[in-house]
């Protein structure tokens, strides 16, 4: 089964002024496409993997043939992470306040004390990730919310965690607009979070 690049659920310029069109086109059409291409190239000679979903490939990496395990981890992770990432974003053209609401809002307040405390912890995870990686809000096996970060394109499902929100902190995600000021990019991200999607994923994961 060949994996394909999903379409963006909005126009490439729809996340302006927070995420610029040039970055979105490059990030989706070039970087994400490359992960898809490399993943397909890695698994094309392993017919025993044809019926596995992306999540199944990454949930038990030890079951992946050793000769392609690293390629699946890196490129499968890159494909899954980005496929989720686009859905965690939505346009906010008027720059209105964007806070967690609904069930996830209540759960964040219960686990972290307040939305602002959660946001501070998430920003610290994203800022403190040395080099390339991701910051995540995940549900652990006990159903509790946690903030974690992973290196490179590792996805938390490989560690038994279910991501309900994630932020790409690779430089390709922000350098054209925010240059080396990662904290400004992280702050911009919170203007775009699609909390409806986060609520949907949380309801399934808890």
Curated annotation (Swiss-Prot):
Could you list this entry's UniProt keywords, alphabetically sorted.
Manganese, Metal-binding, Oxidoreductase
Gene Ontology molecular functions: metal ion binding; superoxide dismutase activity
Q: Which cofactors must be present for this protein to function?
A: Mn(2+)
Q: Look up the record and report any one GO term of the cellular component aspect.
A: cytoplasm
Q: For this UniProt entry, which segments traverse the membrane?
A: none
Q: Cofactor binding mode, per the note?
A: Binds 1 Mn(2+) ion per subunit.
Q: Which InterPro entries match?
A: Mn/Fe_SOD, Mn/Fe_SOD_BS, Mn/Fe_SOD_C, Mn/Fe_SOD_N, Mn/Fe_SOD_N_sf, SOD_C_sf
Signal peptide boundaries: none
Q: Which residues bind Mn(2+)?
A: 27, 82, 168, 172
Reaction catalyzed = 2 superoxide + 2 H(+) = H2O2 + O2
Q: What is its EC number?
A: 1.15.1.1
UniProt family annotation: Belongs to the iron/manganese superoxide dismutase family.
The job of this chain, per UniProt, is described as:
Destroys superoxide anion radicals which are normally produced within the cells and which are toxic to biological systems.
User: What's the protein called, per UniProt?
Assistant: Superoxide dismutase [Mn]
Query: Per the UniProt entry, what species is this protein from, by scientific name?
Result: Lactococcus lactis subsp. lactis (strain IL1403) (Streptococcus lactis)
């Amino acid at each position: 089964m060949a994996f394909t690049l999903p379409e963006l659920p909005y126009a490439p310029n729809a996340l302006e002024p927070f995420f610029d069109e040039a970055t979105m086109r490059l990030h989706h059409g070039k970087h994400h496409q490359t992960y898809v291409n490399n993943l397909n190239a890695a698994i094309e000679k392993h017919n025993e993997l044809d019926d596995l979903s992306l999540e199944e490939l990454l949930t038990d990496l030890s079951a992946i043939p050793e000769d392609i395990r690293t390629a699946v981890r890196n490129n499968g992770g890159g494909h899954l992470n980005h496929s989720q990432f686009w859905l965690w974003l939505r346009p906010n053209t008027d720059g209105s306040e964007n806070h967690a609401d609904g069930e996830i809002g209540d759960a964040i307040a219960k686990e972290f004390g307040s939305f602002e405390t959660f946001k501070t912890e998430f920003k610290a995870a994203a800022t403190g990730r040395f080099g390339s990686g991701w910051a995540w809000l995940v549900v652990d096996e006990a159903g509790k919310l946690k903030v974690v970060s992973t290196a490179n394109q590792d996805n938390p499902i490989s560690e038994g965690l279910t991501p309900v929100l994630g932020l790409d902190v690779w430089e390709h995600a922000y350098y054209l607009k925010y240059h080396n000021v990662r904290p400004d990019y992280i702050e911009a991200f919170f203007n775009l979070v699609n909390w409806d999607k986060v609520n949907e994923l949380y309801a399934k994961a808890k």
